Amino acid sequence: MLRASSRAPPRVRACVATRARHPPRLARGRSARATTHEDVFVDALVHALGAPALDRDDDEELDAYVARALAGRAVVVSRVACIVAECAGLPEATAAVATAKTPTREARAELARARGVASALFNACMSAYNRLKDWESCQTLVRLMEDDAGCAPDAVSFSLAASAMARAARDGEAHAFLLEAESVLKRGTRRNKKKKKVRVDDDMWLKVLYETDDVAAVHKPAGMLTHSSEGAGKSPSLSDVALAQFGELSDLNGSDKRGIVSRLDKPTSGVVILAKNNKAHAELVTQFYQRAVTKTYWALVDGEVPLGAGGTIIEPVDGRPAKSDWEVVETFVGDRWKYALVRVNPRTGRKHQIRVHMASVGCPLTGDTLYRRGRAKTLNVNAPKCVLDSLSGGKTGTTFFLHAGETMFDVAGKRVRVNEPLPVEFSDLLDKLHAASSKASS
């Protein structure tokens, strides 16, 4: 077992205690819990290494910082794992549940929280070793995470370790490790007995934007689920169609999410990357985790914002730090309505991030009711007919205009750029808004 709190290295105990008494001042919009634990871990690691403190700017991810801290230093991996557990509060939380005759709900919740924090820190350390091309330390951390810390490795954990092996040309080890990952991850998956087999016809085939033996980039139409576990329905999901179309896809993320590395909301259209095998899946997950994948979205939003307005939004999503760059590229103004076309580049990949962030600056996505608050509810209540017609195809709040127009990622060491123009419905609506706006201003 990892050492209990009382046996942790004195520098680690002192650092954790100091940080608990004097938490750091947080940048606007950052998650207090996530930032505090990250800062505690960073301080504890640097102190334990006996290394000078390294400057870290707001744009540097935790794993990149840890890689810089570990670079050139001989550090026993189990020591890093001990620091992770200590900073997450895992020894105390585990002991509180293990020693209690009947653990309280609060104690169990605290253990679950500590395991969640520890898992996130473990993954950051694995990504750091991945950056350092140290596949053996990645593998060891997965073992320590599972056997000693009591944290279940997830698809990200296995992907970071497997891609480190593949990048080091240890294909045999990577293959064996991914086979083990399939078995471990399937044990924690509850089978969906209600899922019915859906029929996929040839006319449903996805538009292929890019393809190799290992990956494919396809166009997801608006209104299609990315994978079947997102909700019930008789219509095939993108994963269903892709499996029928390509014949074989990765299953590292579960049998109901075959090939899916990153999802898009049902109303969102655009580029989706698929992994055809688990080795490619692990590499793509690593690229997403290390922010090597860049995406550009186009969104139609409500509100009056000047042309060229924009900036960087730093606002947590579901308690996790999130950042997006945005810019207004066209405005549409009528007598009683105002819209804007914005370009958004998410720097992180949280669920509903763009929807949350645009609503946070007073420009919710046109048609999106979920994140509309306060005065935003009164925006464009007298919408033009072209907008009303475009939103009339489904229930209120289930249609909005968001398109993943460009994705860049690496394949075999080369940078790949995949573009997909706006869908006809989106483009036609912009043309009609432009015409109506020009008429109103004349």
Task: Report each predicted region and the residues it spans.
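N-terminal chloroplast transit peptides
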Residues: M1-A20
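Hydrophobic anchor position in alpha-helical repeat solenoids
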Residues: A44-L45, Y65-L70, V80-V84, T99, ...
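Hydrophobic packing position at a conserved site in alpha-helical tandem repeat units
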Residues: A69, R73, V80-T94, A100-A114, ...
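RNA pseudouridine synthases
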Residues: R7, R21, R25-R28, R33, ...
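Pseudouridine synthase
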Residues: S235-A242, N278, Y289, R336-F409, ...
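Pentatricopeptide repeat
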Residues: E38, L62-D63, A118-N123, S127, ...
